Swiss-Prot record:
Function, as annotated: Catalyzes the GTP-dependent ribosomal translocation step during translation elongation. During this step, the ribosome changes from the pre-translocational (PRE) to the post-translocational (POST) state as the newly formed A-site-bound peptidyl-tRNA and P-site-bound deacylated tRNA move to the P and E sites, respectively. Catalyzes the coordinated movement of the two tRNA molecules, the mRNA and conformational changes in the ribosome.
Entry keyword annotation includes Nucleotide-binding: yes
Protein name listed in UniProt: Elongation factor G
Binding site for GTP: 17-24, 81-85, 135-138
Keywords: Cytoplasm, Elongation factor, GTP-binding, Nucleotide-binding, Protein biosynthesis
Top-level taxon of the source organism: Bacteria
Species of provenance: Anaplasma marginale (strain St. Maries)
Domain tr-type G: 8-283
Any one GO CC term of the record: cytoplasm
GO molecular function: GTP binding; GTPase activity; translation elongation factor activity
SMART domains, per the entry: EFG_C, EFG_IV
Subcellular location(s) per record: Cytoplasm
GO biological processes: ribosome disassembly
Family: Belongs to the TRAFAC class translation factor GTPase superfamily. Classic translation factor GTPase family. EF-G/EF-2 subfamily.
Amino acid sequence: MSSKGDLSRCRNIGIMAHIDAGKTTTTERILFYTGKQNRIGEVHEGAASMDWMEQERERGITITSAATTCFWNDCRINIIDTPGHVDFTIEVERSLRVLDGAVAVFDGVAGVEPQSETVWRQADKYDVPRICFVNKMDRIGADFYACVDMIKDRLGAVPLVLQLPIGVDKSFVGVVDLVEMRSITWEEDSLGAKFNYGEIPSDLMEKAQDYRARLIESAVEMNDEAMNLYLDGGEISVPLLKSCIRSGVIGAKFVPVLCGSAFKNKGVQPLLDAVVDFLPSPSDIPTIEGASASDPQKAVTIKSSVDDKFVALAFKVMVDRFVGSLTFIRVYSGKLTGKSVVLNSAKGVTESVGRILRMHANNREDISEIQAGDIAALAGLKKTTTGDTLCDQNFPVVLEKMDFPESVMEIAVEPVSTADQEKMGTALSRLVAEDPSLKVCVNSESGQTILKGMGELHLEIIVDRMKREFGVEASVGAPQVAYRETITKSAEIEYVHKKQTGGAGQFAKVNILFEPLPPGSGFEFENKITCGAIPKEYIPGVQSGLELVKETGMIAGFPVIDFKATLFDGAFHEVDSSPLAFELAAKGAFREMANKAGPVLLEPIMRVEIITPDEYMGDVIGDVNSRRGRVAEMQDRHNAKLITAFIPLGKMFGYVKDLRSMSQGRAQYSMYFARYERVPENAVDNVMKK
């Protein structure tokens, strides 16, 4: 096994895909073939070890990311299995933030699906090198070559084919290894544990030679020695070819494509070989950038070294009924032992580490030490939340925080028993600590508790967890759309807050420029005060006031997004000014701005993909139009049509029932949040009435 200090023999990878592409099934085979577990857990039987939550086993889907560690070819592989459903995309986001590489699993029949695109873009965001595994090659309709084309066309990637399938559908028996130019077939009675190398079938030899020539031509561009040898007509050895492929993967020049059928126990061992051979180790990504905790403008370079100061990022928090709060971290440099004290530089507090745990889904193994490249869980931390940096107290550095998506749906919840009100508050506070995409607030008018999340399934799971894990049964209101507001024009506001009450009064003057920002920008605050017009101790009051008041809206009480507020001038009074006075002045400036900056209402727009038999296409498109939807694309999908449309979320309630009705149950759909758009003038009144 790899030595603890050898970073080159470590891989931190994620398994990512669209729902039902076979991520967890692939992970279960990996754990079986690496000897991590002695039996294969099947998703459809509710026995997958990585799907440990009751809801996951009942529904056959992954809801929360699960971590484990296994060994292959003297290499330690830390694996995070992520969800494929769009409602739990936050789990993919925070996992990719701390991983060095990823395996993207595709359904060999469906190819690149909507959530495949979403997770691919998330991996692009964090520059995560990846390899592709075209799964389910045993299924009727599986088309490896069409899937490769979709990886190129829909993902904008450069696929580098390393394998070809031997056989199609039920006759799929193995793969052609283009690197070694041999066949690999699996013995079914061994559950795929035994496999054989052999000659390439004669009917595939010409195609294999063609694809290998393409492989070599692309790969040698990564290495001058290999390129010169290739141009001189020399033979490219297998070790040199692998080295070229590895360089190209780490440099994001291309993505290797392999194939198999995890459920039929074919193709997983070569996938593991590819993880070790081609995906980067922590030492291949030698430095990361952070900022000084005392001076955020000062960049700090952190080396991926066991010998440097300890730096780690907390990427997940979960509550374990036996251990309490567990904080999952990725260590970027240095070492950490149990019973240590570390600095949470994001919050400016120290934390005492109780136990260090290596996780296998929800099973725990105590370990004495972790070091650069490790992923583990810490017990005993009290104040650390997702995205916080943990570091040596003598090296206060802050890593880039994580961005979390806006919620698109909300529900009102009340405990069935009034005696459970306090228990519900405790339950929700713990669930929010675990899930940064879940927001909880109280409606100031009705007093109702409002849950805001990523979709109906997300919120349904939260309510179910309250009941199962905390014993709180809640009555739930109908789902509501999470509308937003924004501004369309710039406005410069001068506002004076002045109040005299006999004793010390209140005085604050602010000059703020409000400007619209591009969609998805959120809220930005900039301080441009010079010459002490407003003392620096009052500036946080201005920002706090704007942060609070923007949540109350301008038109219909919905949060305001995608705007910038620049504080450029103001005035204060030596006696009557205070942070509170400036907070109130900022709120007043915001309310005055609402009349001048062209406020508009925004609604979440969903990307909806509908697969329907040809004979129902007209009805389906007509229905899309009736929902204020826009058809963006239509494609042939075997004997059906794939319709891609953009439809307001508010028009999608009850759609599953309507689609079944108009297609006699033969059509299906999936939807994903795309963006916020302005509500048309003729629809604003209907939204306001809600």
